[in-house]
Amino acid sequence: MRPLTPRQAEILELIKRNIADTGMPPTRAEIARRLGFKSANAAEEHLKALAKKGCIEIMPGTSRGIKLTQENTEDADLGLPLIGQVAAGEPILAQEHVEQHYKVDPAMFKPSADFLLRVRGDSMKNIGILEGDLLAVHKIQQARNGQIVVARVEDDVTVKRFEKKGNKVFLHAENEEYSPIEVDLANQSLSIEGLAVGVIRNGDWQ
């Protein structure tokens, strides 16, 4: 199989997770919404590229007409991908970020988890998110005040409590030793990579 671009790998992982969670593939509109595309047409172009590379089959005439090839059907049974160090500028679910897969049922979290992120540092220790824990993350592009999010500020990925005030976003630590990260949306880049939906204590799942 020809190598995938980071974005193609991210879409393929989303398809696998949706099938694992719901028993069916996502629609083009759902892919576009989950990954922040402006239209379903953008998702369609990526799906065509995945089909050309032998990862999926596209069945015309239905909004969920996406079928994993046998190789990728087997991969979908591996479990949730564990994301380690995230390279600057790369999609968080790019294949090179996946350290391994864990046999965890995504549906045990509400909403269901799309991936696990290895926690680095102690900035969220006061709410029980500790160094080395595996944070279960539901991939979504928007957040409400008070939610714990995985956010990308410029090229750095961080786990913090989200608060938006006007044109500014404050990312709050749950550790008094850390000051909030202030992001001025007028001149700084911020994107939400997902919502924290649970924690697996380091060592609980091997």
From Swiss-Prot:
Similarity comment: Belongs to the peptidase S24 family.
Organism: Shewanella halifaxensis (strain HAW-EB4)
Gene Ontology BP term (one): proteolysis
Protein name per its UniProtKB record: LexA repressor
Top-rank taxon, per record: Bacteria
Keywords on record: Autocatalytic cleavage, DNA damage, DNA repair, DNA replication, DNA-binding, Hydrolase, Repressor, SOS response, Transcription, Transcription regulation
Keyword rRNA processing attributed: no
Keyword Hydrolase: yes
Function in brief: Represses a number of genes involved in the response to DNA damage (SOS response), including recA and lexA. In the presence of single-stranded DNA, RecA interacts with LexA causing an autocatalytic cleavage which disrupts the DNA-binding part of LexA, leading to derepression of the SOS regulon and eventually DNA repair.
Site (Cleavage): A88, G89
Catalytic activity line of the entry: Hydrolysis of Ala-|-Gly bond in repressor LexA
Subunit and partners: Homodimer.
Active-site positions on this chain: S123, K160
EC main group: hydrolase
NCBIfam families cross-referenced by the UniProt entry: lexA
InterPro entries from the UniProt entry: LexA, LexA-like, LexA/Signal_pep-like_sf, LexA_DNA-bd_dom, LexA_repressor, Peptidase_S24_LexA, Peptidase_S24_S26A/B/C, WH-like_DNA-bd_sf
DNA-binding region: 28-48
E.C. no: 3.4.21.88
GO MF, one annotated term: serine-type endopeptidase activity
